[in-house]
């Protein structure tokens, strides 16, 4: 920057420097300046005057004055605009050209809120304006619609806050179509060019503010084939996270399993084909899912195959391995079509860059992971609590020590789909073991991971053409940390999981990409991409030439300010810039009458007058043209850089997945090292042996007392344990901690115990508590029986079954009979590893009939009327439930408690010895 330019900058933000050299400024004024130089002339000029690298100077400006703010006309209420409450009620030919264009676009997206860019606002009209104003509590205004039309409803949001408002609309279950400006200056006599650039739906959003950082945002598509004759109900599902690039497909049977899978996935949006006349929400679709329907054509086999071939630029689909899952293939085709339709102006599609860069679809088979149905996930509180749906108090809350968003998502996926392969489990264990033993390495890795950005999603935004300059800088920062992470691992880990290879053998092009970003972008670029100030000097000769010309204009402005001070005799005169009024000369009210004749009054304020001169007005136009060319050139250079980064999205994501997995393992090691965990012995046996094990969540929630550990032994000699004990003694907690330890072991984590041997389970079943399902017309007892039936139909000898009461919601004899029969079937026929907590003490008799059944009880200490829960599990069955004592502790009135004791004593006198009636020796099993 020249001395005179610095002088002008100082005057814009304070007083004029007293040592200003008026003569040098005068020389500058007379110098001829051109703003019509060709690109080549500008390049040549930049070579003659090379620039020193520095952050480009932003255009000086002053805040908007309150009296210059545009005031919107506000309708008194909705009834002021009764005739035009819907866009279909108006004749498009009578509308203004802009509103006619709006209506044309709205007709293509009738089910979406259309946000139409007008200057600094995104506006809605007609029914969208009314809905927007009500949902977001915005002022409903009006806009002139045309001759014979009058005012039509209008509501809008500032463009810089559009993301926040769109997030709210999506949370209300709506989708949004964004119509943006495609040019900055319209052609002569034409409207500014605008078109739909993006469609935002719950499953397709990419903006950081619309996503939950520590969980995936799944978009799913499903194709079903109903049962016909001997053919079962079949379905194919494709689910993608467009923000991370993950793309999974699966194909299975059974409507109940589809419902379970969708409930487990917790997709943000589900797409399905719908024929005319079909119900909008099938019975297998969970109520909470955001459902979007499409035409059936994209889901047909030929169309889906064409879509996949075009999207991935392939000549054959053989390499994708989808031949054996045709329904999943069709679902994948429908999903990709939907993504294409929601990104109508995605950049560079013709050059082979996908609008939403997704990995090749990965087929997931039914036997790849431990099966956890929706009921088990709720009962074990894997990612949220059962009572109020909170994250705190869940298993993930207890064991998540990840430092990156991608690591947190990885750990969540691991917990939702534990491994079945003992080799893969041991590979994770090996890394965790080494990190636990090597504290310095663990802490060093955590220091490197802590500031790491979300490379997965950043790469996705770059690949889709949505990343800003700051996001590219964050990508460069993340890439620069990868070699240091790899170096730490190379030196420490002799054997590591295969997926860490993407980090250990880093793609050599990535460091070069980071260097390119650093070379071009300044370290802290502005949020806006259209106002310049993004790129370093010496990046592009044309940009340097334009900046040289702008510096010359700044020098002219500084000289003009000095000259006008001399001519006016006013040393306090200031030359300033206003984003609405442009450049002007500002003087106080007292000096306004003394200005030269060639000054033209531009604006009057309370304390000052603002003027322009013919020379200043002419020069203003030249500056605006130069500035527009410079900003446009910077944007072009930035888009080229973003495209360069987008082409490397796959490589970045591969490295990011490795970092995410490493972060998850480092976090598990931190939990193990600080939580007194042990490394479980994993094998393919049916045994589950836990010494002094603890509940991983409850022990962290206890503040005033320590958790009481207990032992567990199943699968060797004993397959079923009948667990009895008082109410509120900890039976349910004991069941859950067994299930959580089994799950953690199959994740590859250490477990809260002194010693553990864990045989791999194929499924974990839980039936803990029940509530009415009034919507489905089912009572508590029917819900309980349905859950029990599901367990009995699907459990195997390798399953872990955890039951907390069966048969409570019916008559005592009926309930006890059901509980006995279920327990007997699990132990004798299925031989599943089972713990059955019950208040039917008669079930203790089952151990006398079956050698693989044992009794355990939760101990209590009774002193007079006082009852102390010891929370210790010991061998042997309890003969009392202490329900009346528990009722007293809960605050039941004393007279009711005393009456309950009288009734209990009478019932004991009339007892008919139920165990004898239910003895297997006296009940014949009928074939």
Curated annotation (Swiss-Prot):
<dbReference type="GO" id="GO:0003684">
    <property type="term" value="F:damaged DNA binding"/>
</dbReference>
<dbReference type="InterPro" id="IPR036678">
    <property type="entry name" value="MutS_con_dom_sf"/>
</dbReference>
<dbReference type="GO" id="GO:0030983">
    <property type="term" value="F:mismatched DNA binding"/>
</dbReference>
<comment type="similarity">
    <text>Belongs to the DNA mismatch repair MutS family.</text>
</comment>
<keyword id="KW-0234">DNA repair</keyword>
<dbReference type="InterPro" id="IPR036187">
    <property type="entry name" value="DNA_mismatch_repair_MutS_sf"/>
</dbReference>
<dbReference type="GO" id="GO:0005524">
    <property type="term" value="F:ATP binding"/>
</dbReference>
<dbReference type="InterPro" id="IPR007861">
    <property type="entry name" value="DNA_mismatch_repair_MutS_clamp"/>
</dbReference>
<feature type="compositionally biased region" description="Acidic residues">
    <location>
        <begin position="67"/>
        <end position="79"/>
    </location>
</feature>
<dbReference type="GO" id="GO:0140664">
    <property type="term" value="F:ATP-dependent DNA damage sensor activity"/>
</dbReference>
<keyword id="KW-0067">ATP-binding</keyword>
<dbReference type="InterPro" id="IPR007695">
    <property type="entry name" value="DNA_mismatch_repair_MutS-lik_N"/>
</dbReference>
<dbReference type="InterPro" id="IPR045076">
    <property type="entry name" value="MutS"/>
</dbReference>
<feature type="region of interest" description="Disordered">
    <location>
        <begin position="44"/>
        <end position="80"/>
    </location>
</feature>
<dbReference type="InterPro" id="IPR007696">
    <property type="entry name" value="DNA_mismatch_repair_MutS_core"/>
</dbReference>
<dbReference type="Pfam" id="PF05188">
    <property type="entry name" value="MutS_II"/>
</dbReference>
<dbReference type="InterPro" id="IPR007860">
    <property type="entry name" value="DNA_mmatch_repair_MutS_con_dom"/>
</dbReference>
<dbReference type="Pfam" id="PF00488">
    <property type="entry name" value="MutS_V"/>
</dbReference>
<dbReference type="GO" id="GO:0005829">
    <property type="term" value="C:cytosol"/>
</dbReference>
<protein>
    <recommendedName>
        <fullName>DNA mismatch repair protein MutS</fullName>
    </recommendedName>
</protein>
<dbReference type="Pfam" id="PF05190">
    <property type="entry name" value="MutS_IV"/>
</dbReference>
<keyword id="KW-0547">Nucleotide-binding</keyword>
<dbReference type="InterPro" id="IPR016151">
    <property type="entry name" value="DNA_mismatch_repair_MutS_N"/>
</dbReference>
<feature type="binding site">
    <location>
        <begin position="725"/>
        <end position="732"/>
    </location>
    <ligand>
        <name>ATP</name>
    </ligand>
</feature>
<dbReference type="Pfam" id="PF01624">
    <property type="entry name" value="MutS_I"/>
</dbReference>
<comment type="function">
    <text>This protein is involved in the repair of mismatches in DNA. It is possible that it carries out the mismatch recognition step. This protein has a weak ATPase activity.</text>
</comment>
<keyword id="KW-0238">DNA-binding</keyword>
<dbReference type="InterPro" id="IPR027417">
    <property type="entry name" value="P-loop_NTPase"/>
</dbReference>
<dbReference type="Pfam" id="PF05192">
    <property type="entry name" value="MutS_III"/>
</dbReference>
<dbReference type="GO" id="GO:0006298">
    <property type="term" value="P:mismatch repair"/>
</dbReference>
<keyword id="KW-0227">DNA damage</keyword>
<dbReference type="InterPro" id="IPR000432">
    <property type="entry name" value="DNA_mismatch_repair_MutS_C"/>
</dbReference>
<dbReference type="InterPro" id="IPR005748">
    <property type="entry name" value="DNA_mismatch_repair_MutS"/>
</dbReference>
<dbReference type="InterPro" id="IPR017261">
    <property type="entry name" value="DNA_mismatch_repair_MutS/MSH"/>
</dbReference>
């Amino acid at each position: 920057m020249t001395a005179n330019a610095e002088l002008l900058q100082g005057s814009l933000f304070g007083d004029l420097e007293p040592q200003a050299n008026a003569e040098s400024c005068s020389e500058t004024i007379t110098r001829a300046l051109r703003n019509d130089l060709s690109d080549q002339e500008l390049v040549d000029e930049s070579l003659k005057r090379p620039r020193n690298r520095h952050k480009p100077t932003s255009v000086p400006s002053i805040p908007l004055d309150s009296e210059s703010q545009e005031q919107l006309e506000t309708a008194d209420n909705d009834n002021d605009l009764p005739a035009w409450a819907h866009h279909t009620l108006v004749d498009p030919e009578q509308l203004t050209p802009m509103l006619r264009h709006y209506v044309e676009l709205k007709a293509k997206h009738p089910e979406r809120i259309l946000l139409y860019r007008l200057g600094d606002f995104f506006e809605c009209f007609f029914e969208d304006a009314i809905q927007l104003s009500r949902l977001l509590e915005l002022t409903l205004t009006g806009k002139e619609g045309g001759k014979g039309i009058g005012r039509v409803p209008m509501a809008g949001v500032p463009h810089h806050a559009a993301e926040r408002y769109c997030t709210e609309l999506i949370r209300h279950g709506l989708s949004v179509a964004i119509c943006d400006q495609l040019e900055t200056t319209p052609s002569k006599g034409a409207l500014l060019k605008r078109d739909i650039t993006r469609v935002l739906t719950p499953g397709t959003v990419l903006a950081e503010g619309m996503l939950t950082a520590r969980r995936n945002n799944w978009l799913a598509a499903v194709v079903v084939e109903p049962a016909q004759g001997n053919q079962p109900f079949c379905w194919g599902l494709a689910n993608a996270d467009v923000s991370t690039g993950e793309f999974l497909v699966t194909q299975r049977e059974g409507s109940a399993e589809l419902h379970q899978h969708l409930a487990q996935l917790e997709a943000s949006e589900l797409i399905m084909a719908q024929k005319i006349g079909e119900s909008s929400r099938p019975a297998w679709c969970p109520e909470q899912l955001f459902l979007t329907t499409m035409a059936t054509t994209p889901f047909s086999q030929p169309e889906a195959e064409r879509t996949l071939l075009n999207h991935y630029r392939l000549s054959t689909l053989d390499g994708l391995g989808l031949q054996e899952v045709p329904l999943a293939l069709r679902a994948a085709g429908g999903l990709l079509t939907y993504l294409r339709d929601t990104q109508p102006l995605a950049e560079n599609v013709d050059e082979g860059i996908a609008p939403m860069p997704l990995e090749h679809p990965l087929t997931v088979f039914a036997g790849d992971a431990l099966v956890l149905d929706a009921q088990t996930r709720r009962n074990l509180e894997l990612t949220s609590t059962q009572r109020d749906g909170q994250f705190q108090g869940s298993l993930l809350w207890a064991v998540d020590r990840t430092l990156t968003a991608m690591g947190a998502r990885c750990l969540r996926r691991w917990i939702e789909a534990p491994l079945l392969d003992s080799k893969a489990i041991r590979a994770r264990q090996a890394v965790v073991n080494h990190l636990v033993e090597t504290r310095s390495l663990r802490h060093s890795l955590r220091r490197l991971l802590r500031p790491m950005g979300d490379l997965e999603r950043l790469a996705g935004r770059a690949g889709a053409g949505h990343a800003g300059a700051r996001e590219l800088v964050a990508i460069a920062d993340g890439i620069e940390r990868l070699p240091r992470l790899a170096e730490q691992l190379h030196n420490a880990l002799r054997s590591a999981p295969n997926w860490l290879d993407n980090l250990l053998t880093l793609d050599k092009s990535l460091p070069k990409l980071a260097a390119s970003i650093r070379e071009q972008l300044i370290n802290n670029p502005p949020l806006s991409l259209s106002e310049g100030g993004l790129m370093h000097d010496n990046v592009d000769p044309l940009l340097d030439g334009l900046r040289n010309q702008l510096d010359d204009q700044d020098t002219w402005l500084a000289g003009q300010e000095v000259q006008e001070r001399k001519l006016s005799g006013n040393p306090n005169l200031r030359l300033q810039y206003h984003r609405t009024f442009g450049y002007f000369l500002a003087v106080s009210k007292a000096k306004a009458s003394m200005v030269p004749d060639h000054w033209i009054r531009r604006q009057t304020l309370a304390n000052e007058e603002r003027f322009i001169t013919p020379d200043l007005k002419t020069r203003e136009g030249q500056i605006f043209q130069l500035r527009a060319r410079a900003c446009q050139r910077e944007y072009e250079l930035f888009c080229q850089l973003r495209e360069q980064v987008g082409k490397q999205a796959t490589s970045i994501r591969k490295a990011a997945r490795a970092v995410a997995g490493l972060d998850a393992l480092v976090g598990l090691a931190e939990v193990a090292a600080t939580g007194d965990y042990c490394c479980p012995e994993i094998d393919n046996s049916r045994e589950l042996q836990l010494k002094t094990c603890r509940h991983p969540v409850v022990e962290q929630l206890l503040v005033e007392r320590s958790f009481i550990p207990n032992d567990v032994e199943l699968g060797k000699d004993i397959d079923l344990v009948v667990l009895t004990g008082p109410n509120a003694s900890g039976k349910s907690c004991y069941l859950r901690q067994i299930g959580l330890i089994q799950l953690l072991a199959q994740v590859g984590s250490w477990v809260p115990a002194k010693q553990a041997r864990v045989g791999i389970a194929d499924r974990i079943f839980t039936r803990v508590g029940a509530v009415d399902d009034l919507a489905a017309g089912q009572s508590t007892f029917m819900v309980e029986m349905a859950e029990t039936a599901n367990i009995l139909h699907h459990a195997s000898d390798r399953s872990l079954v955890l039951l907390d009461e069966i048969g409570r919601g019916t008559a005592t004899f009926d309930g006890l009979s059901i509980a006995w029969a279920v327990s007997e079937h699990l132990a004798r026929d299925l031989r599943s590893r089972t713990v059955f907590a019950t208040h039917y003490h008669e079930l203790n008799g089952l151990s006398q009939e079956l050698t693989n059944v044992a009794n355990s009880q939760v101990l209590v200490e009774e002193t007079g009327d006082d009852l102390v829960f010891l929370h210790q599990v010991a061998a042997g069955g309890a003969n009392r439930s202490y329900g009346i004592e528990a009722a007293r502790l809960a605050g039941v009135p004393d007279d009711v408690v005393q009456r309950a004791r009288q009734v209990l004593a009478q019932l004991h006198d009339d007892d008919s010895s139920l165990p004898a009636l239910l003895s297997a020796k006296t009940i014949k099993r009928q074939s």
